[in-house]
């Protein structure tokens, strides 16, 4: 019986040492230390041992079982710590993996076109000048050869703030402001918001314009045509036919409306171009001598040209959009396309 107990002890210790997982540890407990385990079976057999050996064998059996139970608890504690450390390690982020790309919005289509227009003119040597949205009547009208009661003022549905203060109806006031402070030669564009009391599928009360001005000696209409033709080919990324039609603007003389071949039909004639094959895109002309006199330039020495274009108009043609109001309705289905 004593030898049987020692054999069982050696077998149990060897089995416990080899255990590496909690599942195997539970199987060990049931096999050796459970109610129906091997040690329980041996303890029940002590009754058949000689009476004089029973106390010694019982004490030996209890000692072996107590030692195994202590070693069992140590093993369980060790495995529990290993499992906890492993879980902690697995829960840590892998810093070697690439990070998630943050969600970011896109620039508004009007902003994209505005930046593209400015970049094209900057590449031609034009500087960018910005001015106030709330303007004085003098710079918005009088300095541009549009005095009080001039019939040309009827062309502008103006938002007046108070007295002679108004929301600018075009970015042309920056021409006068820049020329007052800078001697020729100069090349500048003035991008920004403008305001007119008008709202339909092709007009909004607030929209964006870019005004351009070039002043130097011996500037001719041919220079104007060359600059604008190059710009239109670059902004629409194709060699579009361009034509200049006589027109009238108070601050330029001669003046012209600039048309391009319809981008919808390629100049063949469609509903958008009203079967003409042409689309009006901007206005331009040679700076009127009266404007030069207002800012102290000598019109006998210097000449120049000016032009103005609507950013929304460019964007509508560039992206084939038929309603200007889509730009300002904040519809993500529309804006996410750009």
Curated annotation (Swiss-Prot):
Binds 2 magnesium ions per tetramer. GO terms for molecular function: ATP binding; magnesium ion binding; phenylalanine-tRNA ligase activity; tRNA binding. The keyword Ribonucleoprotein does not apply. It holds the Pfam family tRNA-synt_2d. SUPFAM superfamilies: Class II aaRS and biotin synthetases, tRNA-binding arm. Gene3D superfamilies: Bira Bifunctional Protein, Domain 2 (3.30.930.10). It is found in: Cytoplasm. Its EC number is 6.1.1.20. It is an enzyme of class 6 (ligase). Residues 78-92 have a biased composition (Low complexity). PROSITE patterns: AA_TRNA_LIGASE_II. Mg(2+) binds at residue 253. GO terms for cellular component: cytoplasm. It comes from the Bacteria. Its cofactor is Mg(2+). Residues 71-101 are annotated as: Disordered. GO terms for biological process: phenylalanyl-tRNA aminoacylation. The keyword Transcription regulation does not apply. Its main location: cytoplasm. It catalyses: tRNA(Phe) + L-phenylalanine + ATP = L-phenylalanyl-tRNA(Phe) + AMP + diphosphate + H(+). Keywords: Aminoacyl-tRNA synthetase, ATP-binding, Cytoplasm, Ligase, Magnesium, Metal-binding, Nucleotide-binding, Protein biosynthesis. PANTHER family: PHENYLALANINE--TRNA LIGASE, MITOCHONDRIAL, PHENYLALANYL-TRNA SYNTHETASE. Belongs to the class-II aminoacyl-tRNA synthetase family. Phe-tRNA synthetase alpha subunit type 1 subfamily. Tetramer of two alpha and two beta subunits. This is Phenylalanine--tRNA ligase alpha subunit. It comes from Desulfotalea psychrophila (strain LSv54 / DSM 12343).
């Amino acid at each position: 019986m004593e030898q049987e107990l020692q054999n069982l002890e050696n077998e149990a210790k060897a089995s416990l040492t080899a255990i590496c997982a909690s599942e195997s540890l539970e199987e060990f407990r049931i096999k050796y230390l459970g109610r129906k385990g091997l040690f329980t079976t041996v303890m029940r057999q002590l009754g058949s041992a000689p009476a004089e050996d029973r106390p010694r064998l019982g004490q030996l059996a209890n000692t072996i079982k107590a030692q195994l139970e202590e070693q069992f608890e140590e093993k369980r504690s060790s495995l529990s710590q290993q499992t906890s450390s492993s879980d902690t390690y697995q829960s840590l982020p892998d810093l070697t993996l690439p990070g998630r790309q943050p969600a970011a919005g896109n620039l508004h289509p009007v902003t994209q076109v505005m930046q593209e227009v400015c970049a094209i003119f900057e590449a031609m040597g034009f500087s960018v000048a910005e001015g106030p949205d709330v303007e004085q009547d003098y710079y918005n009208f009088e300095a541009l050869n549009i005095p009080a009661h001039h019939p040309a003022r009827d062309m502008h549905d103006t938002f007046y703030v108070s007295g002679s203060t108004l929301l600018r109806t075009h970015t042309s006031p920056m021409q006068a402001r820049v020329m007052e402070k800078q001697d020729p030669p100069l090349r500048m564009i003035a991008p920004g918001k403008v305001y007119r009391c008008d709202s339909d599928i092709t007009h909004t009360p607030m929209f964006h314009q870019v005004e351009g001005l070039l002043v130097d000696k011996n500037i001719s209409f041919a220079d104007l045509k060359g600059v604008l033709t190059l710009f239109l080919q670059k902004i629409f990324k194709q060699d579009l036919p361009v034509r200049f039609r006589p027109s009238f603007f108070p601050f330029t003389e001669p003046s012209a409306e600039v048309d391009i071949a319809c981008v919808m039909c390629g100049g063949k004639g469609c509903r958008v171009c009203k079967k003409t094959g042409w689309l009006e895109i901007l206005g331009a002309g040679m700076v009127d001598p009266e404007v030069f006199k207002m800012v102290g330039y000598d019109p006998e020495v210097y000449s120049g040209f000016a032009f103005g274009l609507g950013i929304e108009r460019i964007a509508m043609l560039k992206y084939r959009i038929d309603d200007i109001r889509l730009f300002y309705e904040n519809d993500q289905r529309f804006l996410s396309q750009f």
